[in-house]
Regions:
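N-terminal auxiliary segments of SAM/dcSAM-dependent transferases
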Residues: 1-30
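Class I SAM-dependent methyltransferase Rossmann-like catalytic core
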Residues: 25-52
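Conserved alpha-helix/loop element of class I SAM-dependent methyltransferases that forms part
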Residues: 50-65
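A short glycine-rich, Lys/Arg-flanked "PGG" loop and its adjoining helix->strand segment in the class I
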Residues: 149-161
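Core SAM-dependent methyltransferase catalytic element
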Residues: 218-242
Length: 242
């Protein structure tokens, strides 16, 4: 409570909006990750176009000597639409669950050195010491802190020493929102009889502080919040090195 007036401090404005969204959608069934994106593949790029400035930002931050790139959760390659023109000889390995989005990516960039893998990137072997850089765009906010840290450790292993990792992702504005999202996802899993290990489409974002902590716990060096673009307080860009 406030010492000045005896009232509890006001909640963050985004918390009220988030609670209202949870209440409005509480009866919606969970969908598998692959099923969610395959069902919406036709409108995916139009929906994601709002992050055009973020794609360009990520592309500009890739080290100029990048020759081998890992794209985790590449989808239809919206970030690659900005990255590939900058790196004409770039070799890309993209991993995604959606066959339809991967097909769209290949259609957009014929003749480019793309190795596209339809797989769950939380389980797929990313290899060791393979890539100069790795990127992940708006994909890892469906993972718990423990799942994310484990994946980040594997991404780190896949990089060559000194390799760069760029992650642009949805973040929780407050710790309360992070906790609310996690609790609601668990409730819906129980309701729908879905095992904890099944990959479902429900946002469980971390706060920026926890995102940095996960990067550090995974062994990355120089983990930093690069920033947020004006007008978008919930999409942050992080950078780290192996």
């Amino acid at each position: 409570m406030s010492a000045a007036d005896g009232h509890a401090p006001a909640a963050h404005p985004e918390e009220a909006a988030y609670r209202a969204w949870l209440a409005a959608t509480r009866d919606e069934p969970l969908e598998s990750m692959a099923g969610f994106f395959d069902a919406r593949a036709g409108g995916y790029e139009a929906h994601m176009a709002r992050w055009a400035r973020h794609y360009a930002w990520m592309a500009a931050l890739l080290p100029p000597d990048t020759a081998e790139l890992l794209d985790v959760g590449c989808g239809s390659g919206l970030e690659l639409d900005y990255i590939l023109p900058r790196f004409p000889r770039l070799r890309v390995t993209g991993v995604d669950l959606s066959a339809q989005l991967l097909r769209r990516l290949r259609e957009k960039h014929p003749g480019r050195a793309l190795t596209l893998v339809q797989a769950d990137y939380t389980r797929f072997d990313l290899g060791r010491d393979r890539f100069d850089a790795a990127v992940a765009f708006e994909t890892m906010h469906h993972l718990t802190y423990a799942q994310k840290t484990a994946l980040l450790a594997r991404i780190r292993q896949s990089l060559r020493p000194g390799g760069c990792f760029l992650c642009c992702d949805y973040i929780a504005a407050t710790q309360a929102i992070e906790e609310l999202a996690l609790a609601e996802c668990a409730r819906r899993r129980r309701r729908d009889g879905i095992a904890d290990g099944a990959f479902v489409h429900f946002d469980i974002p971390l706060t920026a502080a926890h995102e940095l902590q996960a990067l550090q716990s995974a062994g990355f060096r120089d983990a930093a919040l690069v920033g947020l673009l004006d007008g978008d307080a919930n999409t942050a860009l992080f950078r780290a090195r192996r």
